[in-house]
Amino acid sequence: MMKVVSPRTRSDSITEKVFRRVYSNFNISTVEDEYIHRQRSSDYEKESRLRKRGLEDKEEVMEMEQMGAERIKTVLILMSDTGGGHRASAEAIRDAFKIEFGDDYRIIIKDVWKEYTGWPLNDMERQYKFMVKHVGLWSVAFHGTSPKWIHKSYLSALAAYYAKEIEAGLMEYKPDIIISVHPLMQHIPLWVMKWQGLHKKVIFVTVITDLNTCHRTWFHHGVSRCYCPSKEVAKRALVDGLDDSQIRVFGLPVRPSFPRTILNKNELRKELEIDLNLPAVLLMGGGEGMGPVQKTALALGDSLYNSKESNPIGQLIVICGRNKVLASTLASHEWKIPVKVRGFETQMEKWMGACDCIITKAGPGTIAEALICGLPIILNDYIPGQEKGNVPYVVDNGAGVFTRSPKETAKIVADWFSNNKEELKKMSENALKLSQPEAVFDIVKDIHHLSQQQQRIPLFNEFSY
C-alpha cells in the first residue's frame, strides 16, 4: 500500500495536483482522504454490498470471488495509427486470442489518446505523417527525445494534465489486462494507474513492434511483461532498467494467417492468376504506396525482359496501397513482362506466398511477414530512427540486401532470376531461419498465464461512476 503523508506547508506535488484534479467531482476533500478511501479492505466492501442483498455469509463471498475469477476477461489494447504496424500488431494479438481462447477474452483495440485527450496526444497521427515526409525533422524528434530525462519530463507533464481524461478512457472499458503496442502508451497510463492505486490490480504488458532500433519510451519498469521481438531489443530493455524476469523474446506479432495457413505456391498462383512458370518479385509501397515504387517498377520491367530472346525472365506484382494515382499510372503502362498492379490488399500472406522475393522499405511488420514466407528481401528505404536498425537485422543475417537505387534493385532481381539462383535459394533459407512464426501465439499464451496467476476481481469493478 502507498504510504499516506499528511499535507505540509509547501507547494503541492504533481501527484497531489493530479489527484485533486481527477477526483474533484467526487467531493473528496484532500488527496489523503482519497488515499484512505482507496485503502479500505476490499473484503469489507464486497461484504457490505452482499449484506444489502441478504448474503452475509463469508462462504458465499468466497464463492462470488471464484465466479469473478472465471468470468470473461477484458483486454484493452492501446495503439495509435502512427504508421500501419501498430494497428496490424494489435489486430494480430486480437485474432490470436480468439484462436487460442475463444470467448474467454473480450478484446478492445482503442486509440485512447485520440478519443479522450487533447493536443498533442490526440493529434499524433497527423503529426507523425507530416514528420516522416520530412525525414530530417523526424530524425531530430526521434533522437532529441531519446534521453530519459527529456521524455520522462514531457510525458509526466502530459500525464498530470490529462489524468482525468485518461482515467475516463480506461474506466469505460474496465480492463483486466492492458496491452500497449505503441511507444508513447507506457509511461502515461502506468503513472495514472499508479496514482489511482491500480498498478497492482491490472496486468499491463508492452509488445514492442520495432525489430532492432527502438525508442526508449518503449521501456517502463512498471510493466508486468515486455515482449521483445529480438535479442537486440531485449538488451536495450535491460539497459533501461527492466528486470530479466519481465522480458520475453518471442518475435514480432504478425497476423495468424501467416504462420497458421499452409500455402502451396502453385495453388496460390492459380488463384491469383499469376504465371506458374516465371519467378515473381513482389514490389511493396506500403499502405500509402510511398517510396520509389514507380521508378523501381519501370526498371524491373526492363531488367526482367531478355531482349536477345524476346521473352521475360520474371514477372512483377506491385502493391500500390491507397495510392490510386500510382495504381492508375502503372496499370496504363505497356509492359513487356507479366505485371499485376494491385491497390490496398488485406490478404498479403497469399501474395507473399506466391512470390519468390520482395522489395520493400524497412518496416518491421512487412519484414517479419516476409521472413515467415521465406522471401529474400531487398530493402530500398527506411525511416530514420526506429527503422534504421532493421537494415542490418536483415542484411547481417543473410536474408536480404539494401539499396536505394531502383536500377540497382532491378539488376539484383534479374541476377537472382537468371544467373544467381543459388544465392536466392540461400537467402530464402536464411529468412526462414530468422523467422518467428509462432510469436503472436507465444505472446497471448504468456499473457493468459499471467492472467491465470492473478485470479482476481478487478479494482475497476469496485467503483461506480
From Swiss-Prot:
CDD domains per record: GT28_Beta-DGS-like (cd17507)
- Activity versus pH, per record: Optimum pH is 7.0.
One GO cellular component term of this record is: chloroplast outer membrane
Checking InterPro entries in the record gives: Diacylglyc_glucosyltr_N (IPR009695), Glyco_trans_28_C (IPR007235), Glycosyltransf_28_UgtP (IPR050519)
Q: Top EC class per UniProt?
A: transferase
Q: What's the catalysed reaction?
A: a 1,2-diacyl-sn-glycerol + UDP-alpha-D-galactose = a 1,2-diacyl-3-O-(beta-D-galactosyl)-sn-glycerol + UDP + H(+); 1,2-di-(9Z,12Z-octadecadienoyl)-sn-glycerol + UDP-alpha-D-galactose = 1,2-di-(9Z,12Z-octadecadienoyl)-3-beta-D-galactosyl-sn-glycerol + UDP + H(+); 1-(9Z-octadecenoyl)-2-hexadecanoyl-sn-glycerol + UDP-alpha-D-galactose = 1-(9Z-octadecenoyl)-2-hexadecanoyl-3-beta-D-galactosyl-sn-glycerol + UDP + H(+); 1,2-di-(9Z-octadecenoyl)-sn-glycerol + UDP-alpha-D-galactose = 1,2-di-(9Z-octadecenoyl)-3-beta-D-galactosyl-sn-glycerol + UDP + H(+)
Task: Tell me where it resides.
Answer: Plastid, Chloroplast outer membrane
Task: Name the organs or tissues of expression.
Answer: Expressed mainly in roots. Detected in flowers, leaves, stems, siliques and pollen tubes.
Q: What else is known?
A: Auxin activates expression during Pi starvation, whereas cytokinin represses it.
Q: Which family does it belong to?
A: Belongs to the glycosyltransferase 28 family.
Q: What is the name attached to this protein's record?
A: Monogalactosyldiacylglycerol synthase 3, chloroplastic
Species this protein is from? Arabidopsis thaliana
**Gene name of the encoded protein:** MGD3
